[in-house]
Amino acid sequence: VTKSGLKKAVYANIAKAEDVHGAVVNGAEGIGLFRTEFLYMDRNQAPGEDEQFEAYSSVAKAMGGREVIIRTLDVGGDKHISYLEIEKEENPFMGLRAIRYCLKNTELFKVQLRALLRAACYGNIKIMLPLVCTEDEVIKAKSLLEECKAELSAEGKEYKKDIKLGIMVETPAAVLVAERLAAVSDFFSIGTNDLTGYTMAADRGNNEVSYLY
């Protein structure tokens, strides 16, 4: 509670499903960021739908109805996953990463979206898209989400029909078109690390320019 009497909830960030237990023990009032890229790392192939479903639903159950914000695959930049065969780029932080990669590799993306839709039946899960720059990216992601819903319905599988979908605001472009993004998103999360880095053109890991960061 702030001095002015405003109550602020304290959420935890997690990288793996098992991390949720530490969050609960330490009194987290929700999960503000589940970094799902860690599910894809240190292995030879992408996790399947059922494996992802188990991971996401276990976190939702452990949080007992409290908010769980799950970020879709945020690959690229400094997050290299060998079997995804992303071509080497001159500047990977400005290249094919995060939502850009997922929208180009829709089958991989849909596996994750299907797992999230199914897992959301077991708690208060919300989906968050990383590195969004344009409203078109959100619209395309929502279209894929609707495709997944139709597929799950046809297969007779249970899923949450009204799942919330938001974005990470972590580029100057997203800030400039925030009003338009708000019209197609259910919520915003401010990604201060990348937003500061892109705004100041400064690498937070570079001591020579750390004064800018």
Model-derived segments and spans:
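Conserved alpha/beta-domain cores
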Residues: 2-213
